[in-house]
Regions:
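Active-site acidic/histidine proton-transfer and metal-coordination neighborhood
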Residues: 1-59
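Sequence-level detector for tyrosine residue identity
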Residues: 7, 21-22, 43, 49, ...
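Conserved, mostly hydrophobic/aromatic
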Residues: 32, 63, 132
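Histidine-acidic metal/acid-base catalytic patches
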Residues: 58, 69-148
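Active-site-proximal loop/turn and secondary-structure-junction residues that shape catalytic pockets
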Residues: 3-7, 36-40, 64-68, 99-101, ...
Length: 148
């Protein structure tokens, strides 16, 4: 889940989110994850860690591409490590990977956050075992064409 809107007060928004989280049944709570946002004024991995994971233990799905837009002052490696820290022992952390459609098509009119058709770069896992969800317009074809 993307926390999304800050509504002018990130702290209060996170508190409301946590209040609502505790209204969910335990089966739903066990399956819930949060993901870092792709806009600078939204939620970084660091903000999710302090505002959600430390409070109620919800794991963070690290999105590599979103991190480029909303770093929270952390390097990619540090943000990934912080997200991994939120996952329960024995569960492989999940992350999302996508690339820029704007760069792929050399077209500045394309929205900066738009996903590319295929994946061209090597996904840097920094030595971690991860379940990587590829987010690309060509779906399975992007996975089949990926060179690692």
């Amino acid at each position: 889940i993307h926390i999304g809107g800050a509504y002018g007060d990130k702290k209060a928004t996170l508190e409301r989110w946590i209040d609502n989280y505790y209204k969910l049944d335990s089966n739903t709570q066990m399956r819930l994850t949060v993901e870092n946002d792709d806009k600078e004024n939204m939620y970084s991995v660091k903000e999710l860690y302090k505002g959600i994971s430390e409070q109620c233990g919800v794991p963070i799905v690290f999105d590599y591409y979103h991190h480029k837009f909303c770093t929270g002052g952390l390097s990619e490696r540090d943000a990934l490590n912080l997200a991994i820290k939120t996952w329960p022992k024995g569960i492989t952390p999940c992350c999302h990977y996508s690339e820029s459609r704007r760069k792929e098509h050399l077209d500045e009119s394309i929205k900066a956050q738009a996903h590319s058709d295929l994946i061209e770069s090597t996904i840097c896992r920094y030595g971690h075992e991860l379940d990587v969800v590829v987010e690309a317009k060509h779906k399975e074809l992007a996975v089949l064409n990926y060179k690692y």
